[in-house]
Amino acid sequence: MPALRRAAALAAAAQPVLPGANRVPGAASATAPLVSFSTPLLFMKALLLAGLLAGAGAPAALAQTPNLPPVKTTSFRADTLSILKYGAVADGQTLNTESFRKAIDACTQAGGGVVLVPRGLWLTGPIVLKNNVNLHLAKGALVQFSANRADYPLIKTNWEGLDAVRNLSPLYGADLENIAITGQGTFDGAGDAWRPVKKSKLNETQWDKLVASGGALNAKKDTWYPSEQSLKASTMDKPGVLTASKTDIKDFADVKDFLRPNMLSLTRCKRVLLQGFTIQNSPAWTIHPLLCDDIIIRGVTAKNPWYGQNTDALDLESCRNGIVEDCVFDVGDDGICIKSGRDEQGRKRGVPTENFLFRNDKVYHAHGGFVIGSEMSGGARNLYVQNCTFMGTDVGLRFKTARGRGGVVENIFVDGVDMTDIAGQAILFDMYYAAKDPVPLKGESTAPPEMKAEPLGEGTPQFRSFFIKNVTCKGAETAILVRGLPEMAIKDISIENAVLEADKGLVCQEAENIRLKNVTILSKETKPVLEIQNARDITLDNIRYASGAEVLLRVSGERTKNVKVSNTNTKSAKKDVEMGANAPKKAVSITKS
């Protein structure tokens, strides 16, 4: 028990070192303590939290927690340099790119410190971060990035898990250590100058106004592009991706307008703090750490238009060791998203995203609240989600992949998620992801194609060892959808202590060792409440549902076997089990409570 008390004390006391007698006002935020541990999982979490938050001074026993090393925190000199000293003008008209560059260069050359952005409207081109610099936005500071695409040079970088050429990100850093962006100001990425827009995502007035602003329409007149060059590039196959025949930046000059940058891009950086600010109107992904270690993201708000294509809030790609807490996301694509490279390139890189804690985060509009995939070819593991809230997302917990991705996703722990008004699935495991919106647009379908088993290979993805408990959802299209591949079942999923209100209940296909315990499913459609197809070793323990359901459980598929129902009042349904096509007669056993 002394170790637990020490873990709690460390978790309560630890916080990143910030400037201003070493602190800038408003930049610090205390970490909530842990006070009790009633299960082995909570014991693991205590060690995780202590390790993540304690830093280099943690006792050796905690630092040695398997696969959960401590997060190393940032530390800065108290010296503060204002961008005003370097000629910046807050009139919303003067381009302050050089002033930001000079201030950041002077700060890093002096050994580091704080670059202060005072209150005001600051127009600028891209800002390139440097070692040992904390870029701090005062309350009321608005950094407006230029809408002139010519202000952003092309660079070699990464796009959706592949080596590619893109425009330089508005906020950019590579191969840095000990960096921060803090404060209570706002960054605006001028995303409307970059993004295509689908007609189906706007009302008539909005669409007419957008078309009248200029740009170009595709042949079907259902997608708007900011320029003719952007439209032309949209018809090409992976126009920004580096290939054997296109290896130089100049090879991509004719499609520059199409190559949207991610808004905040950090590559191969160590000891990163992002805290307190608002970041909005991104051209593409909003916050994208790639191959970064030791990341703390605290109290950050990301806001993008709901129609914004690819405007994920946070994409952690092949990153290790961090905490994301008290953040608020309201965007046009995924909310919190875990990635690790795409297909062969991701597998060759072989760096999973691992050892992260996500807690007390809120996601409003997004394709998914907490998401893994689909670009997860390097794998993901040891991720903890605690006490998060999703309101109005398309999917709540969204785990997506597809054939060809490869990668292993494992050891995912979720404890405490509340959801309302989920348009699609509250909990989704899907190996049929096809880069479509999770909620079909008019004329689209999300039904999986008929697929036969294929030989296993390095491109076969794997989902296994997920532990989900204490989840509530008030309103969804489907409570739980588990959809594996014929050649690779989704395995070892535990869902416990959940109350899920949805139109449909459970759909489980191509899965193995799935366990539901103390789960209430309040579905409008009750024929059936639970549907299992080609799945094995399914445990349904103390399942509650609305009285008078037509069919509690339907099973089908010749590979279905060992479905066990226990501690469940099967008499509340008009029919307890319905055997569908090709289902073995002894596939289901019911233990009366």
What are these regions (language model features)?
Residues 2-3, 8-22, 26-35:
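N-terminal polybasic/positive-inside topogenic patches
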Residues 14, 38, 564:
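Extracellular cell-wall/glycan-interacting regions and their flexible linkers
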Residues 45-57:
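Bacterial N-terminal signal peptides
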